[in-house]
Each structure stands twice: as C-alpha cells, then as structure tokens.
Amino acid sequence: MKPSLIFSQYVWLVNTLRRYGRMTLEEINDKWQDDEVADGNPLSRSTFNRHRDAVLDMFGVIIECDTQDGYRYYIDNPEVLDDDTLERWMLNSLTVGAVLADSQSIHDRILLENVPAGEEHLQTLIQAIKTSHKVEICYARFGHSGYNIYVAPYALKLWHQRWYLLSSNGKYLITYSLDRMRSVKVLDQTFKLPEGFSAEAYFSEFYGVLTDNEVPLKHIRVRAYGQTPNYMRTLPFHSSQKEVETTDNYSDFTFDIRPTYDFLNALSSGGPDLEILEPKELRKEMKDWLQSSLDKYKDE
C-alpha cells in the first residue's frame, strides 16, 4: 500500500471519530467502506488496531473503547487537537494533502498561496533541537550579504506562511527567518535548555514573532465594525482576546499584550473597521501612524 494512502487512512480515522463521536467498530467500518480511503477493502480489527496505534504515535490522539457502552470507540483526549498545537497542525496539513491528492483533475482550479523558501532547513533544525546541538547558520538579511551565526536552537514557530527559529547566542534570545538562511550545519557542541523554558510562554505576550520586552504589557480595547467582529471571532488575533461588548453596530474586544509593530500593523490592516479605544496613548500612536501614511498621498 502506498504510504500516502496509509497516512490518509490515519487522518480519516481521526476525523471520523471527531465528526461522529462514539462509534462501534462495525459503524466505523460502514463509513470506511463508503469512502475511497478504504481502497476496496473492509476495515479489519487488526488493521483498525494498527491504525489506532499509529494515530497515537503520530498525533498523540488516544482512541479508547468504552466496554460499558456497547464497545464504542472515542477520542479520549480531544484537547490535543485544540488550536495552536503541533498535532492539530499536522492533522490539518495531512487532511489538506489527502484532499488535494484526490483532486488532480481540477488542479488548475485550486489556487494556493506562495510560501517562501526555508522548509529545506526544517529537518536539520528539528534534529538539532531534539539532540540539543548548536548550529552554524549562514544568514542573509534583506539587502545584506550573508554572514555566519552560531546559536543554540530553542524552538520553531510558523507565522503567516513563514518559519522562524527562536535561538540563543549566549546573551540574548533572537528570532531568525528560515527563508533568509542559506545553509544550516549541526555542530558537535551541545547546549542545555534553561530550566522551565517554554516557547509558548515566551511568545504569549506578543503578536507574531517580533518580541521586545521594553514594550510594556498593556490592556487594550479595540472596537470592530461591519463584518470584522465575525472574522475576529473565528480567527482571534491573540490568545488573550476577549469579546466584552456586542451591539448591532459594533463589538468591542480586549487584549492583554505588548503592542509591538506587528500588532499595530495587524490592527491597521483593518482600516476603518478597527479602532483602538484604550489606552489613549496607544490610540494616539495609531492615529499618528495612520496620519503618516495619509501624508504620503497629500499631493493627489
């Protein structure tokens, strides 16, 4: 069996249990045989058990059997597939990959976003992170020639279709974009991750990958108009986002965040449909920023 089909079967099993909830093996098999993923074969108990083990290894998803409820199978830890988890991202990626693989006949009608280079360094960096080895990177900032850096790789983050490496040079934590890396070499020298370090906690007070601890943490209130509240509900700007007021004309959201350039840029992209209400100094900063942009059009 082709590896791509096997992965599709793993994804199918997880998504089926997520969609339909508790199911007996017979019920799962009925759904299985109605789908192309079955490849014309019924789902035997041995195949189901192998896939069940593989799903645990690959996604960390535990499929349990409730012997008190007619031997129905269910996902025992659905929280592992919550937003912003590696397991959720892997499942979504494989799900999309499986769907696209079955859609070659209409490939010219499925348009994908261009993704910058850099993925070729992922495997090397992941290996270095797993084994706690430092790396040598030939890095080229925009408009500059390449230069070598020697860092301890702490974590990887995917943001707006770009991969970033959070690393330490021994004094500071620095984030590098993988698409600006010309080469990556794993060194023999090892490093020790600081006790209690959490990449999620490190980025938790910021929007995106640009971090600056000199920017104070602020409680921010934003008013959204039109359809923007719906977009913010379905895809929150930040984990601290809360909807605190809802009316027919607008909705107010609050954030507890350090408002760096990335966050202000994201708010400004909302145009007239996003307005900073508080704090007043941040409202003025945004006003000055927008005025600066408007000044560029004064000659028209």
Residue ranges and their predicted role:
Residues M1-T85, S292-E300:
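Short, basic/aromatic recognition patches that contact phosphate-bearing ligands
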Residues V11, L25, D53, G60, ...:
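Bulky hydrophobic/aromatic content
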Residues L13, F48, S132, V222, ...:
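A residue-level signal for conserved active-site and pocket-lining positions in enzyme catalytic cores
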Residues R22, Y150, T175, T254, ...:
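Short aromatic/basic micro-patch
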Residues I63, L156, V184, E243-V244:
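A structural signal for short hydrophobic beta-strand segments in well-ordered beta-sheet cores
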Residues R72, E136, Y164-L166, D252, ...:
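General beta-strand recognition
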Residues R109-R221:
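Core beta-strand-centered patch of the WYL/Sm-like small regulatory domain
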Residues S204-E300:
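Polybasic (Lys/Arg-rich)
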